[in-house]
Amino acid sequence: MGGDLNLKKSWHPSLLRNQERVWAEEKRALEERKRIEQLRREREEERQIQELQRLQEASGKGRQLNRVDWMYQAPSSATGHYAEEMEGYLLGKRRIDGILLKNDESKKLEKGTDVVGANAAPPPVNNPRDTMAKVMADPLLEIKKREQAAYENMVKESVRRSQHIRDKDRDRDRERRRDRGDRDRSRDRDRSHRRSRHEDEDAHRSHRHRSHRHRSRSPLSPDRSDRKRGDDRDYRDERDRRDDRRDEHRGHDRRDDRRSERDRRADRGDEDRHSSRYKDRDDRYDHSTRRRSYADRSPSPRRGNHYYDRRRTEDRSDGYHRDSRNHDRPEFYRGNDRKVNKEPRDSNLRERSSNTRDEVAGNKEKVLEEERKKKLAEMMSNADELEQKRLQRIAEVTAMEEKEREADEKQRSERGRFVGQLHRQLQEDSLDDRIRRSRGGLERMED
């Protein structure tokens, strides 16, 4: 036979594993019973101690308060274990019931000696030095002293930290003011340098333009003058944008060199740069408006056309007469006349170019005025059409609402008429008619 197959079951009691588990459970139960018995004995001892204290209080002894005074009382010297007992009391290794029983026994023995030698022995004298030594050796006093020292250190540390924070804020404000002053000075310096450079460039360009006009013999055409003014304006805009980019790049470089705690002031620096840029733009705008006002104060073509046409015809006639006179002169005299007439010709060219510019400006103003009038007429016509459509839509909506209201009133009146007929019929019905109508129901109930 192969043996008992029940040994292969996990629940079989013959297995060593199950036997060990049963032994461990029995051992745990035995230890539990021992702990319960020990706790019961301790409670019984405490009850007996309380009973003894009650009997002592009944016999006339003062009531003992449950305080920590027993820690500072010296144990009886009869045992001969003063140091060990004191260490056990302080560390909690000795039981309180044994201490109380020993104290009771020692007090019983001392009671007889007190009665015998009451008259002979003088009362105990409290030495102030001993009292001070006991107070200084008090562990609770030491604990209080340490707590007070820790509290004072904490207060001093908080005061020192707040003072350090105030000093740091003061230093940060001082650095911020210094950086703002440096930034303002550098911005003013860059602005003045840029303004002086722009003024030099404008002066050089105006001088070059005047020299070019003196050198040229033929007047500029309107398209060419407009193109030249557009090129100058584009050049000025490109120069301003380049200066702004240079300022921004310089501001970014200065911000990168500062410490990390100054990063929150970058927005303020950006606002200052934007305000300076807007100020430069306003300066350019004022300069352009002054230039336009100066151009507007110049004589218009309508007022001076007759004068300039007369001057032009006189110049032509004078030139024709001079040319006819010069045909009979030798080459040397004709050259001298050309040199003499050079200045009037340049002045005529300047007058012609100014006349052409004024004519172009007048034509542009006329075209703009016509376009503005045309747009205004279109807007007025569109507004009239929209107003007509709105009025037509309002009329349609009001007509539709009126029809719906009439239909509702008609339906409501018909419904009221029907309900009124029903009420009138009910009022006119008699008892015989009601019984006649309900006779069929009564017959069915009888069946």
From Swiss-Prot:
Keywords, alphabetical: Coiled coil, mRNA processing, mRNA splicing, Nucleus, Spliceosome
GO cellular component: U2-type spliceosomal complex
Basic residues composition-biased segments: 205-217
A GO BP entry: mRNA splicing, via spliceosome
Disulfides per UniProt: none
Bias (Basic and acidic residues): 153-204, 223-288, 306-377, 400-417, 432-447
Coiled-coil regions listed in the entry: 15-59, 363-403
Listed InterPro entries: CIR_N_dom (IPR019339), CWC25 (IPR022209), CWC25_splicing_factor (IPR051376)
SMART domains linked to this entry: Cir_N
Compartments, record wording: Nucleus
Region (Disordered): 153-384, 400-447
Quaternary context: Associated with the spliceosome.
Similarity annotation: Belongs to the CWC25 family.
Database matches in PANTHER family: CELL CYCLE CONTROL PROTEIN CWF25, PRE-MRNA-SPLICING FACTOR CWC25 HOMOLOG
Known role: Involved in pre-mRNA splicing.
Protein name per its UniProtKB record: Pre-mRNA-splicing factor cwc25
Organism: Aspergillus fumigatus (strain ATCC MYA-4609 / CBS 101355 / FGSC A1100 / Af293) (Neosartorya fumigata)
